[in-house]
Each structure stands twice: as C-alpha cells, then as structure tokens.
Amino acid sequence: MNLLSCSINTLRGLYDISGVEVGQHFYWQIGGFQVHGQVLITSWVVIAILLSSAAIAVRNPQTIPTDGQNFFEYVLEFIRDVSKTQIGEEYRPWVPFIGTMFLFIFVSNWSGALLPWKIIQLPHGELAAPTNDINTTVALALLTSVAYFYAGLTKKGLGYFSKYIQPTPILLPINILEDFTKPLSLSFRLFGNILADELVVVVLVSLVPLVVPIPVMFLGLFTSGIQALIFATLAAAYIGESMEGHH
C-alpha cells in the first residue's frame, strides 16, 4: 500500500511539472493579421532599454572618457572587432547591423532572467524574453539571410549566384539547401537554448527551494551572453563569406 501511495504521489508530482505551459500566446488582431502581443510588448521594452542606453552614451561625450563612456566605447570596440574578424577590411558598413543583432539578442536574453515579467498579468500566456518565441528568432535569422544576400549581390552582382554551381554543378541542390539551413540553424539554436534555460529554472523552482536554482540562473545568464555572441559572429561570418565567395 505504501508503495502504491508513493507511486501515486510521484505521478502527481510529474503531473504538476507537466502543467508548466509552453507556447501559450496572448494574441492581438491587427487588421486581418494575428500577432503575438506578449512578444511585441517585451520587444518594445528591450528596444526602449537600447535606445535609452544609446541616448545616454552620446549625450555628453568627453575627451577624457568617464567610466560610463569607457563602458560604451568598449562595447562598440568589441562589436567592431567581431565584425572585422569575420567580414574583413570591408566591415565598417556592417558594424551597425551586427551591433544591433548582438545587443538586441543580448538584452532580450538577459531580460528573460532579470526582469520580473510575471508581475504583468495577461489574459492568456505570460511575458518572457522575446527570444523565447520562435517567431522572433526566425525573424532575426531571415534578416541575416537578407543581409548576406544583399552583401553578395552588392559586391559581385548577378555573378554571386555562380557560387551555387561551384565546384561542380552537381552540388547545385546542396548549395541551395545550405542557404536555407543557415537561417534555420541560427534561429533554432537561439530559440532552443533560451527556452531550455527558462524551462530548467521553472522546473527546479517547482521541485526544490529557491536557493538551489540560483546557480542555474547564473549559468543561464552566461549562456545567454554566449548565444548572443554566437549569433552575431555567425551572421558576420555569413556576410563575409558571401562577399569573399569562400566556404
């Protein structure tokens, strides 16, 4: 009887964990389109944070930088180094794009762990990091695809498409497929890591006291920063590859 009771309690515990909801959305109707309202809300918050930081950074620049100015200059220098390393000498026009990608993803990832989104109640679903939604990560990956197609066409014209039959026309289907797998791998890698991190924290909080998940939360902050760097680095690498024509 005790064994049966223990089994029932275990099943109840598993049922409680399975009650953690993934994928519920708060929808807005805009014209004939249905959009994810919670993603727009959190994205606007992230954009507001970035715009406010940019305004502070350029408000009163000093010849001898202050601590705050040193921080912003370090961030800019870091983004420039990533762009130059991956793209090459023609990196300057792409610094704003790579920087925007990196900062948006970085702040989005960290907002999921640091901002108390659950305080805001929605009719359906709940607020979370923008990158916790597959639509956001796919949109970022598609922007990257447009960017490296634009870079290749701008540099080489229609000759850019000759890469699809190199080194032999037999590889044409594989080379075309590669351009579809690049954005897919970018989007699913980012989405999967951020979603998994939030799910692990939620499950641990439901199973053990609050103190135990804290190391996991710090690990999540670290991996969130790494994911932003990986996305920006790969985006820059794809752009550099399309301009140079090498694999």
From Swiss-Prot:
The chain crosses the membrane at residues 38-58, 95-115, 134-154, 199-219, 220-240. Key component of the proton channel; it plays a direct role in the translocation of protons across the membrane. CDD domains: ATP-synt_Fo_a_6 (cd00310). It is found in: Plastid, Chloroplast thylakoid membrane. F-type ATPases have 2 components, CF(1) - the catalytic core - and CF(0) - the membrane proton channel. CF(1) has five subunits: alpha(3), beta(3), gamma(1), delta(1), epsilon(1). CF(0) has four main subunits: a, b, b' and c. It is a multi-pass membrane protein. This is ATP synthase subunit a, chloroplastic. It comes from Fagopyrum esculentum subsp. ancestrale (Wild buckwheat). GO terms for cellular component: chloroplast thylakoid membrane; plasma membrane; proton-transporting ATP synthase complex.
